[in-house]
C-alpha cells in the first residue's frame, strides 16, 4: 500500500465526514485511512461506518492525549509506504493523491508538504482567517505577542513522510 492517511480527531464528526467524502473522489485508490479518535465526547464512529464499504478505513478510539500522540498512535498502526498526516478539517481536492504520486515517481522524496490554501468558495473573512493561520508570519514568526520574527517551527500536520524513516518494520 502506498499511502496511509492518518487523522487525529477530537469532537469533529462533521469535519471528518467532509474529509472522507473528499477521499472517495480521489482517482488514486492505493491508500488506507486511519482515524484516531482522541477521547472525543462527540465521536465520529458513525460517520466512519458510513464509509466502510467505500474506503479502506480503520477507526481507533483512545483516551485523550492530544493530537501529537494521536498522530503517533495512528502512525504505529499504519501500513502504507508514506504516512500522510492530516487534520480533520482538511478537504482534499480531486486529483491530490494522483499529483503526489506523479511527483514522487518523478523525484522520490522522504518527506513532503506544501502551503495551505483557502478554498475558492471561502468568503473574504474565511480567506483572511486562513492566511492568518498559515502564513509564515503567523505560523512560525510573529505570534504569541512577539514583536519580531522568531525561529520557524514547522507544523506536524498536513504533510507526508516515508514510513521507513520512522519505523523499521
Where are these regions (language model features)?
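Glycine-rich, basic loop-to-helix element that forms the pyrophosphate-binding segment
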Residues: 62-78, 99, 156-157
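Short aromatic/hydrophobic "clamp" motif used to bind/position activated sugar donors
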Residues: 83
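Cell-envelope/extracellular polymer assembly enzymes that use nucleotide-activated donors
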Residues: 2-4, 32
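Conserved donor NDP-sugar-binding/catalytic core segment of glycosyltransferases
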Residues: 95-127, 131
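Short, acidic, metal-binding catalytic loop of nucleotide-sugar glycosyltransferases
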Residues: 21-30
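Conserved small/polar residues in nucleotide/adenosyl-binding loops
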Residues: 167-169
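A conserved acidic beta->alpha catalytic loop
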Residues: 22, 37-46, 64-65, 87-93
Amino acid at each position: 500500500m502506498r499511502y496511509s492517511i492518518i487523522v487525529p480527531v477530537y469532537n469533529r464528526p462533521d469535519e471528518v465526514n467532509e474529509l472522507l467524502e473528499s477521499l472517495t473522489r480521489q482517482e488514486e485508490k492505493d491508500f488506507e485511512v486511519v482515524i484516531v479518535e482522541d477521547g472525543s465526547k462527540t465521536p465520529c464512529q458513525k460517520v466512519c461506518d458510513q464509509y466502510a464499504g467505500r474506503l479502506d478505513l480503520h477507526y481507533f478510539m483512545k483516551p485523550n492525549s492530544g493530537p501529537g500522540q494521536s498522530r503517533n498512535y495512528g502512525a504505529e498502526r499504519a501500513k502504507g509506504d508514506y504516512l500522510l498526516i492530516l487534520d480533520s478539517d482538511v478537504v482534499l481536492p480531486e486529483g491530490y493523491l494522483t499529483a503526489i504520486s506523479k511527483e514522487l515517481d518523478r523525484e522520490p522524496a522522504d518527506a513532503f508538504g506544501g502551503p495551505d490554501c483557502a478554498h475558492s468558495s471561502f468568503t473574504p473573512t474565511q480567506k483572511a482567517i486562513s492566511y492568518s493561520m498559515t502564513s509564515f508570519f503567523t505560523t512560525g514568526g510573529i505570534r504569541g505577542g512577539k514583536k519580531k520574527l522568531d525561529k520557524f517551527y514547522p507544523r506536524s500536520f498536513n504533510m507526508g513522510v516515508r514510513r521507513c524513516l520512522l519505523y523499521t518494520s
